[in-house]
Each structure stands twice: as C-alpha cells, then as structure tokens.
Amino acid sequence: MNKQIEERFTTYLQTAGYTEKTIKSKTRQAVLFNQWCKKRGTSPEAIDYKSCLKYIEYLKGKGNSKKTINHKLTHLRNYFTYLVIESYRLDNPIENTIIRGEKTQSYYTLLTRDELEDLYYSFETDKVLHDNAYNKMAAKRDKIVVGLLVYQGLDTKDFRGLRLEHLKLNQGKLYVPSRRRSNARTLELKPWQMMEFMEYVNTVRPVLFRKVKNPVDYQQLFPYGEQFTLISVLIKKLKKYNHKVTSAKQIRASVIIHWLAQHNLRTVQYMAGHKHICSTEKYVQDDLESLHDMVDNFHPIS
C-alpha cells in the first residue's frame, strides 16, 4: 500500500471521528487488501466487483466466519469511499455488499407485516376503560403513536424530541430530529395517519396538554411531564392484541427487516436514522444463498 495513501486514509478516518483502535483495524484491513490485490496483478484503484467477490471467497477460505467477513467488508467500504473522495476511483464496488446468512443475535420474536398492521387497525379508540372525554382523547393519541411505531419505525427516544413544527401535514411528512446516536430524517406519513394527525393537533392534543403537570416543552408533539412513560404503557396494551409483542425495540426491528426486503441498505439506513451502515447491516437475517452459490450463480468465476 502506498505510504502516502495510507497516511491520508488515516487522516480521513481521524477526521471522521473514529477511535485510534478502530483506525488501526481499518488501516490494517486496507493494507492486507492491497497486498492481496498486488499478488493478483490488480489494485484497489482498479479492481472490479467480480474480483472483490474473489477476495470474499479468499477470506472464506481462510476460515473467517460470515460475521468476521462482514466486519472486514465494513472496513473496506470505508477505504473505497476514501478512494472515491480522493478521485482514485469513480465508484465503491462493495457499497451494498454483505454476506447474507449471518444471524444477528436477536432476542426478539419478529412480527410479520400483517401482525404489525393488525396492531394499528385493531387498536380501540372508542371502547375505552372509564369511558370519559380524556380517556377517549388519550386512546386516539395512542393509536397515532402505534402508527408511528408500525409505519415509520420510530425509536422510543425519537418521540421525546418531536415538536409540533416537525409535523409537516401540508407535505404529508414527519421530520425526526437527530439524537446523539441517530441521524435526522424526514419520513412519509400514510394518508390515514395525516387525517388522524389533523384531528390530533386541533382537538386531541389541547385536551391532553391540560392534564400534563410541568410539561417539558409547550411545543411537544406528544406532551409529557417529568417522566416519559407513554411507550411503556402502550406496549402493555399492545400485548393484549398480540401476545408476541414484547417491546418497542421488537416492533422497530421487525419494521426495519421488512424495509430491507423492499429497499436497498442506504435507503433503510436513512429511514431508520442509523449513523453508520453497519448498524443497518445487523438487521439482515435472511438465510439466502451461501457465498459460494452467490458467486457461482450470479458472478461465474473460472
């Protein structure tokens, strides 16, 4: 590996905010990849996707697990991105390449798409315990929150940061602000969500706000006081509709995995608010073709 490129790559990683330990790991993988390329008469600047698959096959032959290979590919993606930024390459050949079949350690029983939608459509807003105006308003709010869990895959902490100004009903969208561990994103609302939000803003929210003691912020989309218990209370209700429901994290994980069946990794990364693509890759759990089958069937190598 060219010493000058190695130094610039290190500087690039430092600027990106990686720790010293991570930088060493990424640089080491870049050096090893350069050595492999040199032995085969190519270079990281010139290698194509098909040859990158040969490198993956090489790593597999060295006894690396699928999880380890994916970690190494994550480092190489950073390296290729750097080469593109520095105009050494025009593309990142492994931008969306992952080894499927690696099982993420999941403690959730994932919900199907139908089960997710049933949580929303089955949620009662008319028949509520202690039938009074406030409880009916609270039930309507709760159904909106269920919709944001099921359709937009929001994290529990996302709800705390939502303000009235983030709801863009004229555009049919919701802006979710960034947090320390997540990126901001703008997500589309379903038509029926927009209708419910219109009623919520004009009628429901004002009633609920009057019941909140010491509200954190008068512009909160979902008003709360000293503690935010809305989601934990709501999950208990959802368990009555489907005993498989365990947590908001389980619902979010299910939503993200269904997104991955429809969209590419980068799109799902944005929708989920993940800061790093590797966070999105962890949700890939499909038992698809083995690496060997993928290479032979789709990219024949002599």
State where each predicted segment sits:
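Conserved catalytic core of the tyrosine transesterase superfamily
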Residues: M1-S302
